[in-house]
Amino acid sequence: MTTPHTLLRSLPSDLDPNRLPRHVAAIMDGNGRWASKRNLPRVMGHQAGVSALKELLRCCKDWGIGALTVYAFSTENWKRPQYEVEFLMALFEKVLNHELSEMVDEGVRIRFVGALAHLPGALQSAIEGAMAATEANTAVEFTVATNYGGRQEIVNACRELAEQVRSGRLLPEQIDEKLFAQHLYTRELSDPDLLIRTSGEQRLSNYLLWQMAYTEIYVADVLWPDFDRAAFHAALQSYQGRQRRFGKV
């Protein structure tokens, strides 16, 4: 049987391969609502969301999009019920251990950004192992923002630069946007060209606040576990229909 996924295995013909976003960021919103609509525990929505993420990552590789950054766990998410937080930490570790060999084979390089030192020790070890195992891969740069907060990232960068000024290693007038960006978690990444947020919500939720100064934003009226290649196709159609001015006329 032909499915929508097989129909969209290759880049759709109505998309210009030369005008694809180089770097896509995603806020994977709606897992809990997806589960509630089906009378399932919220954690089952997170489990279903993993499948949607795997498919998006495959799609980026198939369609020639070189970088994907996703918002997996924010600094504010610790306020969720303890059982849900514990489930998410265990889920991250399980997915890393289970999917690592496939990521290596598929050429995916995985990075984690955020306040990683505050994560459980076993998860930190899994993260370190996955990043080391995929460091040489070049097919897709897959970045997972975990225990990440955009404001805290900016504060941390300010503190680092302030300490350099205090110690005499840096003059205040030497600080510019380029130097500041080198002190962010994402210093090895280009800024996102396109942000996709699912579930219809229209806010940034403290995500990549510095990096998305000129990012195109697309809000998908679909819950994250239902975000598929057809939905991604629609996002890319919208992106290619825009003229990016970067402040110019």
From Swiss-Prot:
Q: How is the cofactor bound?
A: Binds 2 magnesium ions per subunit.
Lineage, top-rank taxon, reads Bacteria
Question: Which Gene Ontology molecular function entries are recorded, alphabetically?
Answer: magnesium ion binding; prenyltransferase activity
Cofactor(s) needed by this chain: Mg(2+)
InterPro entries membership: UPP_synth-like, UPP_synth-like_CS, UPP_synth-like_sf
Which Pfam families has this protein been placed in?
Prenyltransf
Q: Which residues form the active site?
A: D29, N77 (proton acceptor)
Annotated Mg(2+) binding sites:
D29, E216
Per UniProt, subunit arrangement is:
Homodimer.
What's this protein's function?
Catalyzes the condensation of isopentenyl diphosphate (IPP) with allylic pyrophosphates generating different type of terpenoids.
User: Would you tell me the protein name for this molecule?
Assistant: Isoprenyl transferase
Lineage of the organism: Bacteria, Bacillati, Cyanobacteriota, Cyanophyceae, Gloeobacterales
